[in-house]
């Protein structure tokens, strides 16, 4: 988790709510009770220490159920970051994958990850094209970040967009200008055109009204206004793609580097170079045994993704987030 100096200005209750400490404590206790015999041998104090260290480092979401990885903003950010680290090599190789293939990759990390989330991401990349076209890693992951991290926001503005498209007044508390009222009235008399989109000014006012009372995470209103001020009309998926490409929004989430650095991971590259050097100087038998060990680890992950925390912790400590194994096996 990121260190936030403003936490010192919060009350105890505000801090607990903002950091979701009680959620993680409840999950830790639940897992402890479910695997009591195992953790008694492991050591309860050590268990709690490693659980919260895992939460802090962001690798606690590996192989967890979908309801868990989407439960908090930190979990969502951590999952996006792990997905990038695990499969960055796809983008580095320039591979294009279909929607079903990206869905399979996500389910390697989260067995019950819903295909609908991937379909919605593909619609952003392909601008609502239902065809299962091939997508680059960079286009997919930045669009996935918006769809997954801001899921509730995306659903809410979709409803607003559909109301505007059909000429209805969205159920949002806004203070419209005289100009926007005239524009809304005139648009109601016209037939909706999905391709043309809706008036960007009215859409922006509706979104700002939504954000004033929204309880979930949403992109910066400054960034939203910046995007919508540059056009007269906007389509829903065109707007989402603009959010996905906005560097400021990406930095606010904090899960991914900016696009020029997306395929760069110095620590991972150094580890890969070290492994390649070891293979180059090792005898064939040594190489085979090393490959076998990696294969066994991969098989153990896929065979039993719902491992107990203790088992997952051993994997994480061995692989430092499980990313080295993924990248090295792909190379």
From Swiss-Prot:
Domain of life of the organism encoding this protein: Eukaryota
Main location: cytoplasm
One Gene Ontology CC term in the entry: centriolar satellite
Biased composition (Acidic residues): 318-331
InterPro entries reported in the protein's UniProt record: CSTPP1 (IPR038968)
Stretches the record annotates as Disordered: 283-331
Subunit-structure text: Interacts with PCM1. Interacts with the complex TPGC. Binds to alpha-tubulin.
Name this protein carries in UniProt: Centriolar satellite-associated tubulin polyglutamylase complex regulator 1
């Amino acid at each position: 988790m990121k260190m936030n100096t403003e936490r010192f200005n919060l009350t105890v209750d505000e801090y607990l709510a903002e950091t979701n400490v009680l959620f993680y404590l409840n999950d830790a206790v639940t897992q402890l009770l479910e695997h009591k015999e195992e953790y008694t041998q492991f050591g309860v104090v050590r268990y709690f220490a490693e659980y919260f260290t895992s939460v802090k480092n962001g690798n606690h979401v590996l192989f967890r159920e979908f309801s868990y990885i989407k439960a908090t903003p930190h979990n969502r950010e951590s999952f996006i970051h792990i997905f990038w680290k695990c499969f960055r090599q796809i983008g580095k190789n320039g591979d294009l994958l279909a929607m079903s293939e990206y869905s399979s990759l996500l389910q390697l990390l989260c067995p019950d990850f819903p295909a609908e989330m991937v379909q919605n991401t593909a619609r952003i990349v392909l601008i609502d094209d239902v065809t299962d076209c091939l997508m680059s890693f960079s286009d997919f992951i930045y669009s996935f970040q918006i769809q997954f991290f801001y899921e509730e926001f995306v659903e809410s503005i979709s409803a607003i967009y559909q109301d505007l498209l059909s000429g209805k007044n969205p159920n949002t508390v806004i203070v419209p200008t005289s100009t926007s009222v005239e524009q809304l009235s005139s648009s109601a008399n016209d037939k909706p055109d999905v391709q043309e989109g809706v008036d960007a000014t009215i859409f922006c006012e509706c979104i700002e009204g939504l954000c004033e009372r929204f309880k979930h995470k949403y992109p910066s209103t400054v960034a939203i206004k910046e995007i919508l001020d540059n056009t007269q009309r906007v389509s829903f998926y065109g707007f989402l793609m603009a959010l996905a490409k906005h560097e400021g929004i990406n930095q606010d989430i904090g899960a991914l580097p900016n696009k020029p650095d997306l395929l760069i991971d110095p620590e991972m590259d150094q580890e890969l170079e070290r492994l390649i050097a070891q293979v180059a100087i090792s005898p064939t038998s040594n190489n085979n045994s090393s490959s076998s060990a990696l294969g066994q680890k991969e098989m153990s992950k896929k065979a039993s993704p719902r491992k107990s925390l203790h088992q997952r912790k051993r994997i994480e400590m061995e692989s430092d987030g499980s990313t080295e194994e993924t990248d090295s096996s792909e190379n």
